[in-house]
Amino acid sequence: MAGKSKNHIYAGFTSGLVSAVVLQPFDLLKTRVQQSNGKSMVQVIKSLNTPLDLWRGTLPSALRMSVGSAMYFTCLNTVREAVAGGRRLTVGDRSTSSLPKLTNTENLISGGLVRGTVGLLVMPITVIKVRYESSTYHYKSIVDAATSIYKHNGMRGFFYGWAATFARDAPYAGLYMLFYEQLKVALPSILFSDITTSSHSEKYYSSWSSAMINSVAAATSAGIATTCTNPFDTVKTRMQLAPKEYPNFLTSVKTIIQHEGIQALFRGLALRICRKACQAGISWCIYEDLVKRFERMNLPGPQL
């Protein structure tokens, strides 16, 4: 079990790191669109000094995503293994994944609980990331951001927006896992017309087929789950950037709707869908491929 856990830690860390660095511009633009009172994405882009400004906040993003993904994927697999109780693919079945197979309800609950918990654990990094990306605060470094937050808000400042974060992350991950696992079963016959008539002597589909199926399933699932949970993300961002104006979840929702209308809760949705869909496609594809490679090589994973 220890060796298998290392596989998931390494695969999760790598997938999170790659997706964070590649997709940081989407995250920064999403944060600034959500913090503004009606500014369009074009206006936000024009306000940037140089193209490199799009990668402002990459360090905390990479730290949060790499560590968070390592924790999430490892804990998720542990929980799913325990829930599955030894269930395996039936003889003749092939898969794009080496992960345990669960029912829809089990996927929904396990994904939600694990993601919600991990989200709370990495909250301090998330708060630093959001403030560093925004145009409201002008921190000189990550250390300066952390010091300033602690000086003005104490330890409590690192957990602003925790309720909105949990309300966003748990449903998002639960819905994501539900749709992701279903799509992985449905997509092979849709994307590849001859895949169901090919030989079933192999346990998994080819690496290329698996990557295509997993990426499309991940991106589609992320788009659906993101749309459903975007209001919570908007509220979370406001609470972390202006805690005095948005002191708690319910007050924040009321304030936003009263002053900007209900549509403001979906501000930044297009950017978030783009980022989440791409992030899911990249991270889950890399993660599942690395886990399968370790399994095929019968290796315990890199030494940590």
From Swiss-Prot:
It is a multi-pass membrane protein. One of its GO terms (cellular component) is mitochondrial inner membrane. This is Mitochondrial glycine transporter. It catalyses: glycine(in) = glycine(out). Pfam families: Mito_carr (PF00153). It is found in: Mitochondrion inner membrane. The keyword Hydrolase does not apply. One of its GO terms (biological process) is heme biosynthetic process. The chain crosses the membrane at residues 9-34, 57-83, 108-133, 161-184, 213-239, 268-286. GO terms for molecular function: glycine transmembrane transporter activity. SUPFAM superfamilies: Mitochondrial carrier. Keywords: Membrane, Mitochondrion, Mitochondrion inner membrane, Repeat, Transmembrane, Transmembrane helix, Transport. The lineage of its organism: Eukaryota, Fungi, Dikarya, Ascomycota, Saccharomycotina. Mitochondrial glycine transporter that imports glycine into the mitochondrial matrix. Plays an important role in providing glycine for the first enzymatic step in heme biosynthesis, the condensation of glycine with succinyl-CoA to produce 5-aminolevulinate (ALA) in the mitochondrial matrix.
